[in-house]
Every structure is written in C-alpha cells, then in structure tokens.
C-alpha cells in the first residue's frame, strides 16, 4: 500500500481564515466570555459523576519522552462531557476520552514573567524512583508572597483521545513558560466544528457528532470556526512519540499557539500561526 507521511498539512484556499493580532492580544475574547458564563468546572465534574481521586503515576513531560524535564501526578478525568467550560489554573490534569462541546478555556497566570517561573517546583525521579525537586533552592515571588512551586498558578494539561466540538483557548502567558503552560494532545483526539465535515462524517459516531453541532446556534459555530485552537503563548504538543499509525490526532481550522510541536501520527488541515 502507498505510504503516508505521519504528519500532513493541507487546506483549500477558500477555507483559509484571515487572522489579526486583535483576535488574541486580549484575554477578554468571545471565547473567554462563553466560558465565564458557563457552569463552573467543578460543578460539571460533579454532574459527570465526580472525580474519584484517581491520579497518574508520575508522568513525564513531554509525555513519552526519554528526555523529560518535569513530572506530574495528574488527576484523571475520564469519559466526561463538558459544555463551555473554564479549566481552573493549577488543574494540571489528564483528560481521557472526554468531550468538550463549545469553548474549553484554560486558565493560567498571565504575568508569569519571573525568570525562574518554569523551574520553581519542577520535579524529577530520584533514587528508587521517588519524585524529588529538581531545583530545591528556587522560589518565586507572586504578589508579595514567596512560593516554592508555580504549578498551582499555571496549567500543564494532557488530553488523550478527547473530542472537541468547538474551540480550545486560554489566557495568554506573557512569557513562554513551556514547563508550566503546556497542552499535550495524544491518542485519537479530534476537533470538529463543521457539521458537514467529510472527515467527521466518516467517523463511526458521525450521527452523534453532527447532531451536537447542529444543536449549536449557527452564530456560535461561525465564531468557533475562526480557530479550533486559540492558545497564544502556550506550548502545544500534538501527536504521539510512538509510531502506531492507528492513533492519530486530527486538527482542522486555524491553530494559534506560542510554539507547536507536531510529532508521530498527526493530521493537520488548516493554518498554523505561532506567536
């Protein structure tokens, strides 16, 4: 059979969307307003049956990398459905097989300008595989208070096998802090907003996907069609380190990030804009 590149890019000219800096230089966007007006994250988690206390084993960042620079014990949210949600700063979670309908807004501290913000609280595996601080002497001042960990004021998230019917967006970090403000998309993660998307209609659950999209106000779909990902200043990793071509992250539309790393089996149809 004909081989296929693990990462592909392509879009027809009529699909290209014109972007301006005004769309992402302020945090008071249409996307954030939608998330602010929605049911709180904690309430939506409770509605989905609640968090049962499950966490990952110390998980490497980047995920699957032998050269990890930090580790996280992530709370795991599995098989949950969120509708227009703001993910609070400090969540640092793994979302597994979750659905995000509408806007998913990631909250973080925008004024992360301290030179050591990336490193304060960073951990590594020490003797016996026990987590230990990588830089135990480092602290950071936040609003006049000294802290030994910046993870509660940041957001490092992994979405595995999730479905986004809308836009993934977030506060804009004023400095590129990829150890702390990072989004990783792994597994069969999907983004759709067009109810007539040919790729979506080929999915086994196409009827459900299309029904949810058609249930949205058309004006909302048009707004979210401007960008499937609005994460200026963020580090975004798309795809998997392994070579398993049965798992593929599919992105479409305009993707706005601080820096995006596409690896493994990823399929991107649209425009990439890094800030």
Name each model feature, range by range.
Residues 2-10, 15-21:
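Core solenoid repeat modules with strong leucine/isoleucine-rich periodicity
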Residues 26-33, 37-275:
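Long, polar low-complexity repeats
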